[in-house]
Amino acid sequence: MSATETRETRLSTINQSLKERGLKPLRKLGLAEMGEIEILGIQEIHDHSKRFFTDVKFAVKFPNGTEGAFTVRFNANGEVSDGAVLVVLVNGKFAIVKQWRLVLGQWTYEIPRGFGEKLDQARIKGALGTLKIADLPLGTLARELGEEVMRDAEITSVTHLGNIAENSGTHAVTPSYFLVQLEVDEKKLETRLKGSEDWLSVKLWDLKTARREIGRKLCDNHSITAVALATAYIESLPR
């Protein structure tokens, strides 16, 4: 068996183990002789939190020839989708979700995100225009705006903004970013938002406010990346 066949077999064996857990396959093993960290095999798989993620400890060879280990985090169900980050414009304003983040011990203001199987499948098939409200992982946003507002909401456009690595150092996670424009009944929206500053977990910001809050209220990498991608796209449109 040639060296190439051996490497192909090794990659196939590793990817089969990942596939059995619904994890995203490796694209390549890397080659130490070319200055890359080369994957030799799987040492351990830690799936104690597999509902959300799985950590895979790989045996590796470093460019200097020494061998060791490197742990990579994979998204749950990453074989199907690494999730979606949705820049949602409600009647032209950015929908921002306020929520408690246990790991930070604080409230944050974020762009909505969730599991995006239907979005990713539609993108691959070139069928984004066929999506319905129920196909979007709107989560808190939909709950907070309420059935009265969302019942007649209309998707006017869905644009794929790109796939951006979450943490290229340790995570094999590359979520999709989308710009979703929703039109809702303005009177119903005003009624829902009126006097809601203290209890409603959804804020609607104009473009100026969204830009101003980058690095301030918007302080997570998903949200900052999403707003940057969306504003670049919006500014590229013909006027």
Task: Annotate each predicted stretch with a short phrase.
Residues S2-K28, G35, L104-L119, R123, ...:
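Nudix hydrolase/Nudix homology domain
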Residues R27-D47:
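A short, amphipathic edge element
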Residues Q43-V90, Q99:
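Acidic, metal-coordinating catalytic segment for phosphate/diphosphate chemistry
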Residues K57-A59, V88, L179-Q181, L204-D206:
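Short, well-ordered beta-strand micro-motif
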Residues A59-N64, N167-K188:
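Active-site-adjacent beta-strand/loop module that shapes the phosphate/pyrophosphate-binding cleft
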Residues R73, G78-R143, A165, S196:
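Conserved Nudix-box catalytic region and its N-terminal flanking loop in Nudix hydrolases
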Residues D152-L161:
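A short coil-to-beta-strand element that immediately follows conserved catalytic motifs
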